[in-house]
Design a protein with these regions (language model features):
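A conserved regulatory-domain signal marking ACT and ACT-like small-molecule sensing domains
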Residues: 1-173
Length: 173
């Protein structure tokens, strides 16, 4: 159970990526001895999405948010804060025991239709996507390049309603 004098804050930062951005943010958290419970970052075409879930003492949370707002402004990024309840955090932690699967989608090129079909099957089976990662290099715009390969990895969690049916549906794509 979370002590009464601590707060859980989900920090979401978006905007143009640049070297030192994550260091600047975590330096502020370190200044107030915050504990980072989870962190994730994605960069798509130089656009950053950074999430940090931290625990801090209640008397520090306002100072942390104020300093992060000023730092975000000086870096030209957007920062948002979301309070997380103890119950929400505990429910999230308890999800780690669920089954985890890696699904890899491979082709010469991958269309929105193909990705939509895969993710629809996963959703219908009650699976949750934790992460999506491109495993191949950046795809050139020249579609005549026959050596191009595209590969995306989905990290999914949960127990499928019907694993065999899910596998059959995925193999038919």
């Amino acid at each position: 159970m979370q002590p009464l004098n601590t707060e859980l804050i989900l920090i979401r930062i978006t905007g143009e990526d640049r070297p030192g951005l994550t260091a600047s943010v975590t330096e502020i958290l370190a200044k107030y001895d915050a504990t980072i419970l989870d962190i994730g970052q994605a960069d798509i075409h130089n656009t950053l999405s950074l999430g940090i879930l931290c625990k801090t003492e209640e008397q520090h949370s306002g100072f942390i948010m104020k300093e992060l707002l000023f730092k975000a402004s000086s870096l030209g990024v957007t920062v948002r804060f979301y309070p997380i309840t103890t119950k929400e955090y505990e429910d999230w932690v308890n999800m780690q025991g669920k089954n985890r699967y890696i699904l890899t989608l491979l082709g010469r090129k991958l269309s929105a239709r193909q990705i939509s079909a895969v993710t629809r099957i996963l959703a219908e089976q009650g699976m949750n996507i934790d992460a999506i990662k491109r495993l191949t290099g950046r795809i050139p715009l020249d579609e005549c390049d026959t050596k191009t390969r595209a590969c995306i990895e989905f990290s999914v969690r949960g127990t499928p309603k019907d694993r065999i049916a899910m596998q059959e549906q995925l193999m038919q794509l």
